[in-house]
Amino acid sequence: IDNEQPEIALQIFEMNVYAYPKSARALQGLGEGYMETGKKEAALVYLKKSLSINADNPFVNELISDLEEKNN
């Protein structure tokens, strides 16, 4: 994510998910974007959607675990 313009980067991730709603990678990117901008609940939603499409992604599993740990 672009640290100089995180909201613009987030909009690009959102457009990517709009164009490719069943892409695990697009959903992961949006989840990471929300994570980087401090929107943890939204990040969890999209990371979990990504994982539902591609359950064999250890990186996304780790991101979800980290977010859930920080939320508790």
Predicted regions span which residues?
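Conserved structural position within tetratricopeptide repeats
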Residues: 14-18, 51-52
